[in-house]
Amino acid sequence: KCMTKLFNIGNKSSLKNANDLRNDLKNKSIIVVDDGSATGSTLIAAVRYMRKNMMPKRLIIALPISPKGTINKLKSEDINHIEVITGPQDNSFVSIEQYYRNFDQITDRQVFDIMERNLK
């Protein structure tokens, strides 16, 4: 049900579907997954929006890579748990891309297709 609403939001920017999704996620655990967080700015904005508008019971962040300084910045936000696979020292970190063999960008459609296949 939520996957369908996410798909509709992504394709139609439907305010009604966004409101339905917000109600479906209230008091539930939300896991936010990103390909990495260099500065934390996007995740912080997302966390603050979700806390204010979706009111989740728990908010969990999962990242394969994020420098230690960014992880510490994220820890100051209202996040229940942060899971990071690799947290390099700030002075050795250049970009998220340096930790991937292939960092090609994928489309929203590709993400929704993958999620739909794996949720069936």
Where are the language model's segments positioned?
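A short alpha/beta connector and helix-capping loop motif
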Residues: 43-61
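Amphipathic, alpha-helical segments enriched in basic
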Residues: 21, 25, 49, 86-90
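Secondary-structure transition/hinge residues
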Residues: 10-14, 54, 119
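PRPP-dependent phosphoribosyltransferase catalytic core
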Residues: 1-2, 55-120
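A generic local structural motif
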Residues: 16-20, 47-49, 69-71
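Internal catalytic-core helix/loop-beta-alpha segment
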Residues: 1-44
